[in-house]
């Protein structure tokens, strides 16, 4: 579960390395974010020469969580880290590459570009 002030790894080549969650989008009662949810975040670490700089406020979609997500068949999917991909307003990623596996739940959320760029979909 990702909440306010949670730090996440960035799983793309947009230039950011680490982001800090400012707000979970999705209504007033939405306190925690899971896989496929959109957050507003601040860039805390960035690589030089990247598209985003340290201090930028960006939107990102969660692609991996340590807590994991429950599937309709009763199984759970868990990852080793909490990671997100920085997106534009039209749900397309800012970067051109995705690093590491992503969850299948992104397909139902309409993030087909992220799913197609990912090296592995679990």
Curated annotation (Swiss-Prot):
One Gene Ontology cellular component: cytosolic large ribosomal subunit
Keywords, comma-separated and alphabetical: Ribonucleoprotein, Ribosomal protein, RNA-binding, rRNA-binding
GO MF term set: large ribosomal subunit rRNA binding; structural constituent of ribosome
UniProt KW Ligase keyword: no
GO process annotations (BP): translation
Domain of life: Bacteria
Pfam families in the cross-refs: Ribosomal_L14
Main function: Binds to 23S rRNA. Forms part of two intersubunit bridges in the 70S ribosome.
Quaternary structure, from the entry: Part of the 50S ribosomal subunit. Forms a cluster with proteins L3 and L19. In the 70S ribosome, L14 and L19 interact and together make contacts with the 16S rRNA in bridges B5 and B8.
HAMAP family: Ribosomal_uL14 (MF_01367)
NCBIfam families named in the record: rplN_bact (TIGR01067)
Protein name listed in UniProt: Large ribosomal subunit protein uL14
Gene that this sequence comes from: rplN
